[in-house]
A protein has these predicted regions:
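Loop-to-helix transition at the N-terminal end of transmembrane alpha-helices
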Residues: 41-59
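Non-transmembrane, membrane-adjacent beta-strand/coil modules in membrane-associated proteins
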Residues: 2-5, 81-146
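Short, surface-exposed linear segments at secondary-structure transitions and domain or protein termini
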Residues: 14, 97-103, 158-167
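N-terminal membrane-targeting/pre-transmembrane regions
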Residues: 1-45, 142, 146-149
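Conserved beta-hairpin
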Residues: 57-98
Length: 169
């Protein structure tokens, strides 16, 4: 049983935007903590700052935890490894595999872009609703199943595309 592994590194653009957003988030954390220290416990200002702080922490943790690390392909399954959890796609459910060139203009239904990559539920007219796990938009692959569409990025995308097409036939 052969297992192929394809890493999923950041593009330079996504890495730069992630660093910039983390610096801005750090500023938001510090401003909220300063606001909580300066306001009376239990006041509206205290709870507003606490809510903003909690929302910022949630966004950072959520974006970090769902980012793609690598993709593996074995004889029966394509697996998208995230920081926490895996997405398993049985090869016998795959109906079509193709490349994708652009994600920047797609509608985010419940997704994050440019912060650790592009993740979540997206929509465009060609694909409809799809789940995105993308760190590098130059290396995107689309996998269609009977009930869901996945878009992800990995190194050696064309090699993975060829392997998937061979196993589908």
């Amino acid at each position: 049983m052969d297992t192929y592994t394809f890493r999923s590194p950041y593009s330079k653009f996504v890495l730069a935007t992630t660093v910039i957003i983390m610096v801005l988030m750090h500023g938001a954390f510090m401003a909220c903590m300063g606001g909580m220290v300066r306001s009376d416990f239990g006041s509206g200002a205290f709870f507003t700052n606490l809510l903003i702080f909690a929302a910022c922490v949630f966004v950072v943790l959520y974006a970090f935890c769902i980012q793609i690390r690598k993709v593996t392909l074995n004889d029966t399954t394509l697996i998208i490894h995230r920081q926490i959890g895996k997405v398993r796609i049985p090869l016998n459910t795959i109906t079509k595999v193709e490349t994708k060139d652009e994600i920047g203009l797609d509608l985010r239904l419940w997704g994050i872009s440019f912060f650790f990559g592009h993740y979540g539920l997206f929509y465009n007219r060609t694909l409809g609703k799809y789940r995105a796990y993308v760190k590098n938009s130059d290396q995107m692959l689309v996998v269609h199943t009977s009930n869901r569409t996945h878009v992800f990025s990995c190194e050696r995308r064309d090699e993975l595309l060829t392997l998937l097409q061979q196993r589908m036939s």
